[in-house]
Amino acid sequence: MKSPNRLLIGGVLATGLTSIPLCGAAAGFEFTPIGSAFSDDGSGSIRLKMPATFGVALQCGISVQGQVDETGVAQVTRVTFSGSTPLCSLITARGLPWNLVAKSTATVYMEHVSFIYPSGPLCGGNTILSSWTPYTQRLLVFNQIVSTGCEVVSMDVKISMLSIKYR
């Protein structure tokens, strides 16, 4: 007679093995058009807190460029900061490419987000949550900690060349 544990494990394995063919490839969302280059419209804005600003939010412009890879991930390969204060132009993006991974038509994970200010430590390297507004094609971020003492308070970037679709 088989023990109850063996029967349970056997049943779980049999159920798992019979369901594998039914699952198929994982469905998901992707940025389109695949293989296309993209850039923002030049009106992007970002508010950052970092040790170099002593926790005060610094308002800057942000510009992004990149390409959608064959898997539907939008890879941001160039980020520039600008603004009316000279401090903004001293911020440098790190960890590029920043991967924009669509989780739904409205949710995007931004991977590898990091930046540095000359007199401060590296901020980031984390994945942060952002929103995508399909009708205005805007990437929005609110109150995302990228590392200790470093935060993206807000970001708004319009990338009219991109859209998200279910694959």
Task: Give each language-model segment a name.
Residues 117-167:
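A charged, solvent-exposed segment within the mature domains of Sec-exported extracytoplasmic proteins
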Residues 10-20:
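Bacterial N-terminal signal peptides
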Residues 39-45, 105-111, 137-139:
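Short, hydrophobic/aromatic-rich segments at coil-to-beta transitions
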Residues 21-78, 151-167:
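N-terminal segment immediately downstream of the Sec signal-peptide cleavage site
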Residues 2-11:
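Bacterial N-terminal signal peptides that target proteins for export
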Residues 47-53, 112-115, 143-144:
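Short beta-strand segments that buttress and anchor functional surface loops
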Residues 54-134:
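Predominantly extracellular/secreted and cell-surface proteins with exposed
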